[in-house]
A protein has these predicted regions:
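Polybasic/polar functional segments that serve as interface/processing modules
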Residues: 1-69, 73-75
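Intrinsically disordered, low-complexity regulatory tails
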Residues: 49-124, 258-261, 310, 317-321, ...
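Active-site helix-to-loop segments that bind/position phosphate- or nucleotide-bearing substrates
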Residues: 90-261, 265-270, 275, 279-296, ...
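Flexible, glycine-/charge-rich segments associated with ATP-binding catalytic modules
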Residues: 175-177, 187, 284-286, 292-370
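Minor-groove-contacting beta-hairpin "wing" of winged helix-turn-helix DNA-binding domains
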Residues: 265, 422-429
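Alpha-helical residues within the helix-turn-helix
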Residues: 396
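Key DNA-contact positions within bacterial/archaeal DNA-binding proteins
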Residues: 403-406
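DNA major-groove recognition helix of helix-turn-helix
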Residues: 409
């Protein structure tokens, strides 16, 4: 019955009776009586009673009993047994007791409502919406009218903000409406002498969070380029349209029921990760699915609708495809640099590789010959642009160590340094 509760509370599912523990078909001796017993147990142990269907299937003369449990609309569906009243959810292939946060979600779903559409205790008159007005004017060309707060679902007729309105307000009263941003030193959170190269914390309106989060990424991401016949090709470390989409989705679809949580932007040498509290709304794990075919599900539909009106996101819900497609369009993209997604019942993370990163061994060897040749070209481009550029600045632009740049220059017969010290200059032979 715990599995029945879990299926009804999640996406529905099937239970098959007549299969042994080692997955051998053994059948049931009295399938009709077993069906009556199972039906009775469901009706007496589950509250409310979920919609289910019992059928039989014969395989090699063995009768199997199949219980199909449908996704419920009157959640939570509680299991009553062992002196307890508990709700269960599906986590992968297992049925697990619903956490307090998951129970809150089930209650909201059973009421056909969402966190962002619920009324708050905050009065409209106590808060300003200059960020909303400014963005709305910029995107639509129209002025934002006070009555639009109600029509957008941000306020009630009697002058109170909804939770979506509280999140949009300039000085959001929702304390966990915030993002933590860190540029880590290395490939993990223990980078050596200095753990972090840059960090920032932002709170307030979700509109400000988007702007500040993107600004943090931009100031910690380098732009490389190479000359072409008539111009030059830019090669960013991270694709702006991809990380914009990931950040907007993280803020719009995060689980605001999880108190004391926040969106995280973590930049490492080789990747950018954007983490948001709360897993997939349907309880599945994104890494076990094809992200391009996942149907759009809005955990916070009011907030998502406002973001659409402000030009931050589209109604059709193509976020995963946008992140992947915009990466694939880059000239420095390879299959190894494809973004990927990871989730569990508590979190969702988008991982976007650094398109210009080349792995090193002991700081002296770059990963591939092609990578070395790319760096040689980029170094010569920088020298042609500024023949007095320092090796230190080259290293910063390339995102590699000073030692690596010096080695690459030493091994490149086409590069020569004329003169000594600061008075000297680079020359391409």
């Amino acid at each position: 019955c715990k599995s029945i509760s879990a299926f009804a509370n999640t996406l529905g599912g099937f239970l098959i009776f007549g299969i042994s523990d080692d997955n051998q078909i053994v059948g049931l001796e009295t399938p009709d009586k077993d069906a009556e017993l199972i039906s009775e147990i469901i009706k007496t142990r589950l509250n409310p009673i979920p919609e289910f269907k019992i059928s039989f299937h014969t395989e090699d003369g063995n009768v199997l009993l199949i219980v199909q449990v449908f996704k419920g609309e009157e959640t939570p569906y509680y299991y009553s047994g062992d002196g307890l009243l508990e709700a269960y959810v599906r986590i992968g292939n297992e049925s697990a007791k619903a956490s307090p946060i998951e129970l809150k979600r089930l209650v909201l779903r059973g009421r056909n409502t969402t966190f962002d559409s619920q009324n708050s205790m905050y009065k409209v008159d106590d808060y300003a919406f200059s960020k909303l007005r400014e963005r709305y004017k910029k995107w639509t060309g129209n002025s934002f009218d006070e009555k639009d707060l109600v029509s957008f679902g941000l306020a009630t007729e009697d002058g109170y903000l909804t939770n979506a309105g509280a999140l949009i307000a300039d000085e959001s009263p929702i304390r966990y409406s915030r993002i933590f941003c860190t540029r880590w030193n290395g490939l993990n959170k223990s980078g050596g002498t200095f753990d972090a190269l840059d960090d920032a914390e932002y709170e307030g309106s979700v509109i400000s969070l988007i702007d500040n989060g993107e600004a943090f990424i931009k100031r910690n991401a380098k732009m490389m380029w190479k000359k072409t016949a008539n111009s030059r090709e830019e090669m960013p470390e991270y694709v702006e349209r991809s990380y914009h989409e990931a950040l907007v989705n993280a803020i719009a679809h995060r689980d605001y029921l999880i108190n004391g949580s926040e969106v995280h932007i973590d930049i490492y040498d080789d990747r950018l990760e954007i983490y948001s509290p709360g897993g997939m709304p349907d309880g599945s794990n994104i890494q076990e699915r094809d992200p391009v075919t996942v149907p759009s599900t809005r955990r916070n539909p009011v907030l998502a609708d406002v973001f659409n009106r402000l030009g931050y996101m589209e109604r059709k819900g193509s976020g995963f495809a946008k992140i992947l497609d915009n990466y694939a369009f880059q000239v420095n993209y390879t299959d190894e640099k494809k973004p990927y997604f990871r989730s569990d019942r508590y979190q969702f993370t988008v991982i976007m590789p650094n398109l210009n990163y080349r792995g090193t061994q002991d700081g002296t060897q770059d990963g591939t010959q092609d990578g070395t040749q790319d760096f040689d070209t980029l170094i010569m481009n920088m020298i042609e642009e500024n023949n007095k550029i320092s090796a230190k600045i080259m290293a910063e632009k390339l995102g590699v160590s000073l030692r690596t740049v010096r080695r690459l220059i030493k091994e490149n017969d086409q590069i020569e340094y004329v003169g000594h010290g600061f008075s000297g200059y680079w020359k391409i032979k």
